[in-house]
């Protein structure tokens, strides 16, 4: 097996930007996606990292996504913001809307941002991290393609439907979790397939409805929700609030308009942000200290780690050592870029 190719984070960004521009994507979108992928790789979130570049390029070349669409920000009310992504990729739309969301939440105490008509492929923790670093509690929800069966079923009806929550953490490191409501993200299963690995039991069923550990069969069949009916209910919640609530597509509707190029699905994204300084009563420092105590007491128990701790550790390693890219993936990306086109 060929040795992995080691790249600095700056080289990851350049690789992404150059590959996307060579495919015909506009500079602003290419830079935003490059930032998104680089953040994912820095935190060793490979399912949303360089591997996703293949899908982005496919959607540019197929004409599915608008290459030069500039997102438009509008204010429905002082606390409700909207970004029309105009059939473009989500990262630039997120970068357009989140600063306004932060400002509105700090002014009013609570604010929401709906992003419409976007192709979303990125990790949600990165979407809300700026708001949490600004001292806000924040949530984010998005709907994916129809590939998950509801609890007890075997036919896809729901998306992987991830959501994220963040809280301003101690030492400037926010408490953020981000996970799919399926047993695993579809990207994780795709990486298992590419690597020739099995998936754990309970993640999916094959096209015949029988449980499977074959990732190819899982992708052809249906993923399962985590936690049975609990994960299924949470997935439906995400469908409702990131779909009909904001006037965007459900996962089933998204799949119906999908062209099969392997790129990101079309849909919407909902953000909610609350400023503890405005929203709560009593002394803010005391309330934040109560939260810090909760984190400290949890970590004091052997075997406990908080969400996002591993990402921050990975981030420190990546800044120093760069990242390792599987040789086969690097060769595939090189073929997509300026040298291969």
Curated annotation (Swiss-Prot):
Residues annotated to bind NADP(+): 120-124, 178-180, 229-230, 305-311
Keyword Oxidoreductase: yes
E.C. numbers: 1.5.1.49
Gene Ontology biological process terms in this record: proline metabolic process
Function: Catalyzes the reduction of Delta(1)-pyrroline-2-carboxylate (Pyr2C) to L-proline, using NADPH as the electron donor. Is likely involved in a degradation pathway that converts cis- and trans-3-hydroxy-L-proline (c3LHyp and t3LHyp) to L-proline, which would allow S.novella to grow on c3LHyp or t3LHyp as a sole carbon source.
Gene3D superfamilies noted in UniProt: 1.10.1530.10, Hypothetical oxidoreductase yiak, domain 2 (3.30.1370.60)
Subunit structure of this chain's protein: Homodimer.
UniProt cross-references to InterPro entries, sorted A to Z: Mal/L-sulf/L-lact_DH-like_ah (IPR043144), Mal/L-sulf/L-lact_DH-like_NADP (IPR043143), Mal/L-sulfo/L-lacto_DH-like_sf (IPR036111), Malate/L-lactate_DH-like (IPR003767)
Organism: Ancylobacter novellus (strain ATCC 8093 / DSM 506 / JCM 20403 / CCM 1077 / IAM 12100 / NBRC 12443 / NCIMB 10456) (Starkeya novella)
Protein name: Delta(1)-pyrroline-2-carboxylate reductase
